[in-house]
Amino acid sequence: MRDPAPSNSEMKRVIVGMSGGVDSSVSAVLLMEQGYQVEGLFMKNWEEDDGTEYCTAREDLADAQAVCDKIGIKLHTANFAAEYWDNVFEHFLEEYKAGRTPNPDILCNREIKFKAFLDYALMLGADLIATGHYVRRRDIDGRTELLKGLDPNKDQSYFLHAVGGEQIARTLFPVGELEKPEVRAIAEKHGLATAKKKDSTGICFIGERRFTDFLRQYLPAQPGEIKTTEGEVIGRHSGLMYHTIGQRQGLGIGGLKDASDDPWYVLVKDLDNNELIVGQGNDHPWLFSRALVSSEIYWVNPIDLSSPRKLTAKVRYRQGDQPCTLEKTADGYRATFDDPQRAVTPGQSVVFYDGEICLGGGVIEIAEPWTSKDKR
């Protein structure tokens, strides 16, 4: 179902979040073709005062302006750097201090793109906002549902699970019905400057720089020992914050006597002892979990969990739907999976689905081992 076009008698004003990328550029074009009164808004969420050349905000703003000039719409600019620091980045640092691996893009969507931006757009007189996210929405029975994007390779519902239905109801997602090649073709057809611009990667405020170099600017390193599951010390790490469950690269382990040639993986981050526990093999049993616990779930719309419910879930972006049973417990929520789940990582998010409907999700706090013999 495509996002609704306005009736001829009611020209709705829509402000598109223009990132300087091809998806938001095409979103603006599509909305204009549907008859909306379209304007753009470029958000600056990070101050470029860290002495590096990595931040691309100036280039992105120039690209957004070029697109708006080409299609003949006004471009507003807004600085949400203070809100980003207070509501996203400080939480990001606290999570790393606690040894978890957070996903700031999820919090950015909830606090900045669908809160600060939405509020600002409404203040400017907009009826709706729009973004270039690959998701869809559906209005049914007095509520607005968040649906997966039709392109399974680009679906971004995982990152929008913490946005409430009321915010989704005020947002249009023009490219959610399209596949990426179609989006680029539309951009080429209209001669947009962003038509061949590559997709952004990594966390927005880090850009293309090395993550460990960035994190060291804000958090002191806390070196410790790297141990096997048997307790043998085989190396040293520069800080648990620089590692995540299932990580293979960058461990600096090699040439050990009596060890096989199988690669080493991070199995456990022992926060109490500041130790990194590693093991060999992509299918090491310690890498697999049967259940996870989250104390709080953000629902797009409230759901009934008076009894356990069969759903599907993702514990990382682009993962296939994993069948599970979700139940409410005294301390929060517990999801038990039908099949073993690899590298379930505290700090990351679990997102629940009912078919194509994204129901919501929360931060993973505990990953329960798959086998009872696993004494993590």
Curated annotation (Swiss-Prot):
One term under GO cellular component: cytoplasm
tRNA-binding found in the keyword field: yes
InterPro entries: MnmA-like (IPR004506), MnmA-like_C (IPR046885), MnmA-like_central (IPR046884), MnmA-like_central_sf (IPR023382), Rossmann-like_a/b/a_fold (IPR014729)
Cystine crosslinks: C108-C204
Cell compartment(s), UniProt: Cytoplasm
EC number: 2.8.1.13
Primary location recorded for the protein, binned into one broad class: cytoplasm
Site (Interaction with tRNA): H133, Q348
Enzymatic reactions: S-sulfanyl-L-cysteinyl-[protein] + uridine(34) in tRNA + AH2 + ATP = 2-thiouridine(34) in tRNA + L-cysteinyl-[protein] + A + AMP + diphosphate + H(+)
CDD domains named among the record's database cross-references: MnmA_TRMU-like
Chain positions covered by the region annotation Interaction with target base in tRNA: 103-105
Active site: C108, C204
Keyword tRNA-binding applies: yes
A GO BP annotation: tRNA wobble position uridine thiolation
Binding annotation for ATP: G17, M18, S19, G20, G21, V22, D23, S24, M43, G132
GO molecular function, one term: tRNA binding
Sorted UniProt keywords: ATP-binding, Cytoplasm, Disulfide bond, Nucleotide-binding, RNA-binding, Transferase, tRNA processing, tRNA-binding
Region described as Interaction with tRNA: spans on this chain: 154-156, 316-317
Reported function: Catalyzes the 2-thiolation of uridine at the wobble position (U34) of tRNA, leading to the formation of s(2)U34.
Similarity comment: Belongs to the MnmA/TRMU family.
Protein name per Swiss-Prot or TrEMBL: tRNA-specific 2-thiouridylase MnmA
Organism: Pseudomonas savastanoi pv. phaseolicola (strain 1448A / Race 6) (Pseudomonas syringae pv. phaseolicola (strain 1448A / Race 6))
Lineage: Bacteria, Pseudomonadati, Pseudomonadota, Gammaproteobacteria, Pseudomonadales
Encoding gene (name): mnmA
